[in-house]
């Protein structure tokens, strides 16, 4: 079994595993690495098939979580952004003893719109899958542009995301397709009710992929969890609002 790319840095007494989103890699954390590594031992990860973790095909959510867990510290705070939030949540469900706290960023337990549940229309996700086979570079760029729409620094934020993608080899089409399949089909709304560890959910008010309407719905469904919405952020609050984002993590660290 191949190992995935994994880098550890920082000297905090609390371990923090950072999982990126679809189409990306650990370079997305560059804007907050320095700040966080003063307070946490950071674990920067390229998910299987993404960035420097080459040699993997498409995976299910369960397989992806299993791979990441294999190289993880015994106990850590797990933070996942977007698709990474589903992977971190899956780890918390299968190995709660390894998860000191769970943090999901601009993530949803069910990305796809369902009956009485706001999300991405399934035909949009299917459209992305279709376009991937035709022009996957352009499809990834369109998806990145969607993530920063509406913020005051949208252009700059989109450039930051794009440079993270271009810094490393592009994932295989099958891997990208597999990631979209997870976003299209995963539904962890019920299972996550059972979590007992501290659980912090961070959102961007302007997010076009995870509608803000899900926040009060999940506040009600998971009363033990906490939520925070960054008023002027979209899908990548750690890029548009790095200071406030790091403060939220420091506040969580004080509680665990």
Swiss-Prot record:
Protein name from the UniProt record: Pimeloyl-[acyl-carrier protein] methyl ester esterase
Substrates-to-products reaction catalysed: 6-carboxyhexanoyl-[ACP] methyl ester + H2O = 6-carboxyhexanoyl-[ACP] + methanol + H(+)
A Gene Ontology biological process term: biotin biosynthetic process
GO terms for MF: pimelyl-[acyl-carrier protein] methyl ester esterase activity
EC nos: 3.1.1.85
Pfam families for the chain: Abhydrolase_1 (PF00561)
Presence of the UniProt keyword Cytoplasm in the record: yes
Assembly and interaction partners: Monomer.
Localization per Swiss-Prot or TrEMBL: Cytoplasm
Keywords: Biotin biosynthesis, Cytoplasm, Hydrolase, Serine esterase
Keyword Hydrolase annotated: yes
InterPro entries membership: AB_hydrolase_1, AB_hydrolase_fold, BioH, Carboxylesterase_BioH
Catalytic-site annotation from UniProt: 82 (nucleophile), 207, 235
Binding site for substrate: 22, 82-83, 143-147, 235
Similarity field: Belongs to the AB hydrolase superfamily. Carboxylesterase BioH family.
GO CC annotation, single: cytoplasm
Residues of the AB hydrolase-1 domain: 15-242
The encoding gene: bioH
Function: The physiological role of BioH is to remove the methyl group introduced by BioC when the pimeloyl moiety is complete. It allows to synthesize pimeloyl-ACP via the fatty acid synthetic pathway through the hydrolysis of the ester bonds of pimeloyl-ACP esters.
Annotated metabolic or biological route of this protein: Cofactor biosynthesis; biotin biosynthesis
